[in-house]
UniProtKB/Swiss-Prot annotation:
SMART domains reported in the protein's UniProt record: DEXDc, HELICc
Keyword set, alphabetical order: Activator, ATP-binding, DNA-binding, Helicase, Hydrolase, Nucleotide-binding, Transcription, Transcription regulation
Listed SUPFAM superfamilies: P-loop containing nucleoside triphosphate hydrolases
GO biological process, one term: positive regulation of transcription by RNA polymerase II
Domain Helicase C-terminal: 490-644
EC numbers on record: 3.6.4.-
Highest taxon in the source lineage: Bacteria
NCBIfam families found in the cross-reference section: PRK04914.1
Name listed for the protein in its UniProt record: RNA polymerase-associated protein RapA
Residues annotated to bind ATP: D177, E178, V179, G180, L181, G182, K183, T184
Pfam assignment, any one: Tudor_1_RapA
Enzyme class: hydrolase
Length: 968
């Protein structure tokens, strides 16, 4: 093409320079000035990587002064172009704009514009873009979004609760599962779903101070959710940036004490527009109608301002009726406003639970029970169901299940309360206690005697705690460097035990970090035993590394030495040997220690080793835990209650272990209390609530469906392809692990989700669970979601040119592969993607206007194509530009019918689903007062807005690839 001064060209290799203007021409070279950057470039007149910029009728172009022109006519004179059309700001017609006056900052966003401007991408990027569109659309349609990407085992009851609650508008529920059943994971899954769906954007978690780091770790490791921990120093720091420090972060964890002791903080928290509040250990907030505690009032004030509330608490039976009512009152003060009324109502529900027990037991129903069922379900004619349920026919079981479902809908608190018990959830291992009685060394005997004399002024509580840890008493008198481990028989026993069990992974827990560190040194120096240490002094990354070292089968540590606090929130169910080097001071901590191994999914018996020194507080505490509470071999829901009621007597025995008069009677009394409370708890079991919380078949189906999605081959190949194209380094490790690190040539300098020093990932859920340092990559992982956004929100792969070597077709045959996207724009919380995700419609057009996409599948077609360099691509495009315009017009006419069909299907599906949900809630409200009015109103508004936005859905061209046939 001949060059003329003033012509506008664009660089094929440096498109960021904007539009260039020809400012100098000689025999062999031309000079382009790029006004947007002020830079000049010198190019050869022949075969330079530059493309002439020419617009067509119907394009909109921008003048360098900022106004826009809708092009209607294009003229050329002396090699320079003039565009004639309508000026959009003044609507003046017949306006002429010479090309030299075009805005130099011009960028091409439409795929066809980029193609004609020579901004052509590699064909592998085009393929990646199409796959990204296809897979993203498929993932949006799956109903369990937010549940798949969790780094946790697929436990049916957890998935059921999370799915039920996570789908709701502003859920306000009580999660009251027994210890070890995963309330934290349930809450995390609900948070994850609400965030992914756009129902929540700002989340506040309030927990006891000792659990802050545990929650921080759990949210990050299991759900890839980065919360900010607010304490005094972080609060002061944030106060410099904002009048309300809590506005500086979207997701915050803080302690209840941090809020309680400062009125201004509470007001700022309440004003910070949170969407979801999560409160752990909610049963510790005391309440009575006359005098609610300060802690309770704090949460009450927050719950009044925040639409969604999750309270994690002990089981209602452990709480007692009044305390249980207090939690429900936080969730719905209008519904639960009077305690006496609540008690009367609960008594009315007792017969419902009894009826369910009968139905589930398959027993024949007496006339009294039949009448009761008739009264409980009074608005429908259920005679045929009752008759079938009481018959011996094949329909009996189905009729009983239907009656149970009807009763469940009418159950008092089933929508606001979820509670599973170990009795109702299968899959827990047996626990076997091994008591190892060891002699008390003379060094300790002397230290304990001296301590008794010198510590006479200490409180009973302090003396009891001292007596549990004789090595610390010894160090108090002999100095911190005293080598207690040289004579403590527990150390010798531990060494022998580990040597005898070389093939087993062993978790050793002790109260103090210093003890763990000293034991590691002894194991290493005396028997060369590889041990990892895990304590509160380590950073999160250091803890992950220690846990990964312990988990590794190859060259990993045999032993993990944990301090009490350091082990919070970590689970090691790949091990089954637990050594308690000392004992914790209360039953909750004991259960927490055993809970590191005693989880659902543990498939071996847990061997609990307790080496203790005779004639010490340790010996008394072992007896009290085992004989009084049965707390080693079974979970102990009564432990805290008995501990609180017998605390003074217990610590007096621990503080003076030599005085054991009455100890046997004390332990016997505690055992009787334990058995009595256990019986009460069992009799108070609400089978209907357990059924509702457990999820039954629904939970099983969810777990199975998600398991089938695990190890998705499409995900693995897509992810590796994505990492290659984005420029992320990949290094294969053993055990299905890949190390990802940033490179110097990435598409973006900082890839969101990829740490600066890289990370280890796996696509295998089981591997991720056994390796603390490996992230579990699913379609929901931030690296994949951010990768999809990076590709699809930009121009990557939006236009390409390829060659098809096929002797069956004439040379020069032209095909246009077009990818349209049918989509609706709407606020994220409406979740339009459930019904109409951005859906790719692929077309393969020939010169005759025929769409060959149905006959030619994408992947097989893509494998036959060859890449073309950018310069040759530009030449090919310029040669067939007019034909491509015609093919695009033909495709536009064809795509409309497909797009409209997709939109109509989405509208029908949305109307059916949302109308059914609404009708069900309205019907339930008639028989169950726990359906909130605002929930029904929100669903009604949601349905209306979804249908309105679907009516405005449209389609656009997302990507184009020209394919030219060659025989060479």
């Amino acid at each position: 093409m001949p060059f003329t001064l003033g012509q506008r060209w664009i660089s094929d290799t440096e498109s960021e320079l904007g539009l260039g203007t020809v400012v100098a021409i000689d025999v062999r070279m031309i000079t382009l000035l790029f006004p947007a950057t002020g830079e000049n470039r010198l190019y050869a007149r022949n075969d330079s990587p530059i493309t002439r910029v020419m617009f067509n009728p119907s394009d909109t172009i921008t003048h360098h002064e900022g106004w826009q022109l809708k092009v209607e006519e294009v003229t050329q004179e002396n090699g320079l172009i003039t565009y004639i059309g309508t000026r959009l700001d003044t609507e003046e017609t017949g306006v002429a704009m010479r090309e030299v006056l075009l805005d130099s900052k011009l960028t091409f966003s439409k795929p066809q514009d980029r193609l004609f401007a020579g901004q052509i991408d590699r064909m592998d990027r085009f393929a990646l873009r199409f796959r990204a569109r296809k897979y993203q659309s498929e993932q949006f349609r799956l109903p369990w979004s937010g549940l798949r990407g969790i780094r946790a085992s697929l436990i049916p009851h957890q998935l059921h609760i999370a799915y039920e609650v996570g789908q709701r508008h502003a859920p306000r529920v009580l999660l009251a599962d027994e210890v070890g059943l995963g309330k934290t994971i349930e809450a995390g899954m609900i948070i994850h779903q609400q965030l992914l769906a756009g129902r929540a954007e700002r989340v506040l978690i309030v927990v006891p101070e000792s659990l802050q780091h545990q929650w921080l770790v759990e949210m990050l490791r299991r759900f890839n959710l980065r919360f900010s921990l607010f304490d005094d120093s972080r609060y002061s720091e944030a106060l410099l940036d904002s009048s309300n420090p809590f506005d500086t972060e979207q997701m915050v964890i803080c302690s209840l004490d941090f809020v309680r002791r400062n009125k201004q903080r509470l007001e700022q928290l309440a004003d910070a527009s949170w969407d979801l509040l999560v409160v752990d250990e909610a049963h510790h907030m005391a309440w009575s109608e006359e005098a609610p505690s300060r802690e309770y009032q704090v949460i009450e004030q927050l719950a009044e301002h925040i639409p969604g509330v999750l309270l994690l608490t002990a089981t209602p039976e452990q709480l007692g009726q009044q305390s249980h009512f207090a939690r429900l009152r936080l969730l719905d003060p209008d519904r639960f406003h009077d305690y006496e009324e609540f008690v009367n109502e609960q008594q009315k529900y007792r017969p419902i639970a009894d009826a369910v027990t009968l139905l589930l037991g398959g027993e024949r129903l007496t006339d009294d029970k039949l009448n009761l069922l008739g009264e409980l379900i009074d608005e429908q004619d259920i005679e045929p169901l009752l008759k079938a349920a009481n018959s011996q026919s094949e329909d009996s079981e189905a009729a009983r299940q239907e009656l149970v479902t009807m009763l469940m809908d009418r159950h008092g608190t089933s929508r606001v309360l979820f509670r599973n018990t170990r009795n109702g959830v299968k899959g827990f291992p047996h626990r076997v206690l091994h008591q190892i009685k060891l002699p008390l060394p003379t060094q300790y005997q002397t230290a304990i005697k001296v301590s008794g004399i010198m510590g006479a002024k200490k409180t009973l509580d302090a003396r009891a705690k001292d007596m549990l840890y004789p090595e610390q008493i010894y160090q108090e008198f002999e100095g911190e460097n005293a080598t207690w481990w040289n004579f403590d028989p527990r150390v010798e026993w531990l060494l022998n035990y580990l040597v005898a069990n070389r093939g087993e992974k062993v978790l050793v827990i002790c109260a103090q970090a210093a003890t763990a560190l000293q034991l590691e040194q002894v194991l290493r120096e005396r028997e060369a035993i590889r041990a990892a240490v895990f304590h509160e002094g380590l950073s999160l990354i250091e803890r992950d590394r220690a846990a990964a070292y312990f988990a590794s089968e190859e060259d990993g540590a045999q032993v993990l030495l944990c301090s009490e606090i350091g082990s919070e929130g970590r689970n090691f169910q790949f091990a089954c040997q637990l050594v308690m080097f000392d004992l914790p001071f209360n039953p909750d901590l004991l259960e927490q220690r055993i809970g590191r191994l005693d989880r659902i999914g543990q498939n071996r018996e847990i061997q609990i080793m307790v080496p203790y020194l005779e004639d010490t507080a340790q010996a008394i505490l072992v007896r009290w835990y085992h004989e009084g509470l049965d707390a080693f071999e079974h979970t102990c829901p009564t432990g805290r209650t008995i501990y609180d009621s017998s605390y003074q007597e217990l610590i007096s025995y621990l503080a003076t272990p030599s005085e054991q008069e009455g100890l046997d009677e004390f332990i016997h009394t505690c055992r009787q209390q334990h058995e009595g409370l256990k019986l009460q708890l069992e009799q108070g079991r609400d089978r209907l609530l357990e059924m509702h919380s457990n999820g039954g078949e629904h939970g099983q189906e969810l777990a199975q469906s998600i398991a089938e999605q695990d190890n998705d081959i499409n995900l693995v190949s897509f992810a590796l392809n994505l990492f290659d194209i984005v420029g992320i380094n990949q290094e294969d490790r053993s055990d299905n692990l890949i190390v990802l690190t940033p490179s110097d040539h990435m598409l973006v300098p900082d890839f969101p989700g990829l740490p600066p020093d890289g990370c280890t990932v796996t696509f295998d859920r089981e591997q991720a669970l056994s390796r603390e340092d490996a992230q579990f990559v699913s379609w929901e992982h931030p690296i994949i979601r951010n990768g999809l956004d990076l590709i699809l929100s930009g121009d990557t792969g939006s236009c390409a040119v390829s060659l098809l070597k096929n002797k069956a077709l004439p040379v020069g045959t032209l095909l246009a592969e077009l990818v349209y996207v049918v989509e609706a724009q709407a606020p994220k919380h409406l979740q339009l993607t459930r019904f109409l995700p951005p859906t790719p419609v692929r077309m393969l057009m020939d010169r005759n206007g025929t769409n060959l996409a149905a006959q030619v599948e994408f992947e097989s077609f893509n494998r036959q194509l060859n890449a073309v360099n950018r310069h040759t691509s530009s030449k090919l495009v310029n040669a067939v530009q007019q034909e491509v315009h015609t093919m695009l017009q033909q495709a536009e006419a064809l795509v409309e019918a497909q797009a409209q069909a997709l939109i109509e299907t989405a509208k029908r599906e949305a109307d059916d689903k949302l109308s059914t949900e609404l009708a069900r809630l309205e019907a339930l409200k008639a028989v169950n007062p726990n359906i909130r009015d605002d929930e029904i109103e929100a669903l009604e508004h949601n349905r209306k807005m979804v249908l309105e936005n679907l009516n405005q859905a449209g389609w656009r061209l997302d990507a184009i690839r020209l394919v030219v046939v060659t025989h060479q």
